[in-house]
Amino acid sequence: MFFGTFTPKMDDKGRLTLPAKFRDELAEGLMVTKGQDHSLAIYPRNVFLERARKAAAASRTNPEARAFVRNLAASADEQSVDGHGRITISPDHRRYAGLSKECVVIGSVDFVEIWNAESWNQYQAEHEESYANGDDAAFMDFL
């Protein structure tokens, strides 16, 4: 499982060092894809394939589901962590997430998110108060 917030720097070649505590769970391969809120999502390869199969099975008759699966599959990039603990973020993924040198990597329980640092700070500013107040229905499910 993935927990925590980290602020690695991305180099000019689009390489980003993943937190050491995430690497073991991603050692068997990983998939980078476009995530929600213009972030990137990193899944362990086996988790991504399982979710993609479920999504594809549900998408045959629903136009919105088909569009989701197309975007998910078209933006998926299979990778492995290099000997220095890095992955390379494609130019298209960098564009989608607005990534530059300053990045934020967060654990989202069963996957990892990569954010533009400014976008993450803005997201936190917009959502932190409702989290603190317990306004979210998901919060109630957690309790």
Swiss-Prot record:
Keywords: Cytoplasm, DNA-binding, Repeat, Transcription, Transcription regulation. GO terms for molecular function: DNA-binding transcription factor activity; transcription cis-regulatory region binding. SUPFAM superfamilies: AbrB/MazE/MraZ-like. Residues 5-47, 76-119 form the SpoVT-AbrB domain. It comes from the Bacteria. InterPro entries: MraZ, MraZ_C, MraZ_dom, MraZ_N, MraZ_sf, SpoVT-AbrB_dom, SpoVT-AbrB_sf. It is found in: Cytoplasm, Nucleoid. One of its GO terms (biological process) is negative regulation of DNA-templated transcription initiation. GO terms for cellular component: cytoplasm; nucleoid. Belongs to the MraZ family. Forms oligomers. HAMAP family: MraZ. This is Transcriptional regulator MraZ. It comes from Corynebacterium kroppenstedtii (strain DSM 44385 / JCM 11950 / CIP 105744 / CCUG 35717). The gene is mraZ.
